[in-house]
Amino acid sequence: MSLSVEAKAKIVSEFGRGENDSGSTEVQVALLTAQINHLQGHFAEHKKDHHSRRGLLRMVSQRRKLLDYLKRKDVARYSALIERLGLRR
């Protein structure tokens, strides 16, 4: 199950540079993080759902690529985003 429209709008307004900024790297990473966190709860209950696990791994990979891009382009924004999202790096 994906995020609700309200949850996505909240993330966009919180991490975006404007109200309708859904394309910035920070917003994309925040949306992927929310979806990943939601799926982790799903896998606690459905351990053998390998089809969805592949989608989860794809999301994690996409988030990693976006974070690497942001780190190359602007280290300050990268560090701030990692801190706000509570990611390990």
From Swiss-Prot:
Keywords: Ribonucleoprotein, Ribosomal protein, RNA-binding, rRNA-binding
CDD domains found in the cross-reference section: Ribosomal_S15p_S13e
Annotated InterPro entries: Ribosomal_uS15 (IPR000589), Ribosomal_uS15_bac-type (IPR005290), uS15_NS1_RNA-bd_sf (IPR009068)
Pfam families xref list: Ribosomal_S15
A GO term for molecular function: rRNA binding
Any one cellular-component term (Gene Ontology): cytosolic small ribosomal subunit
Xref: PROSITE patterns: RIBOSOMAL_S15
Top-rank taxon, per record: Bacteria
Gene Ontology biological-process entries: translation
Family of the protein in this entry: Belongs to the universal ribosomal protein uS15 family.
Function: One of the primary rRNA binding proteins, it binds directly to 16S rRNA where it helps nucleate assembly of the platform of the 30S subunit by binding and bridging several RNA helices of the 16S rRNA. Forms an intersubunit bridge (bridge B4) with the 23S rRNA of the 50S subunit in the ribosome.
Entry-linked HAMAP family: Ribosomal_uS15_B
Subunit-level organization: Part of the 30S ribosomal subunit. Forms a bridge to the 50S subunit in the 70S ribosome, contacting the 23S rRNA.
This protein's name: Small ribosomal subunit protein uS15
Organism: Klebsiella pneumoniae subsp. pneumoniae (strain ATCC 700721 / MGH 78578)
Gene: rpsO
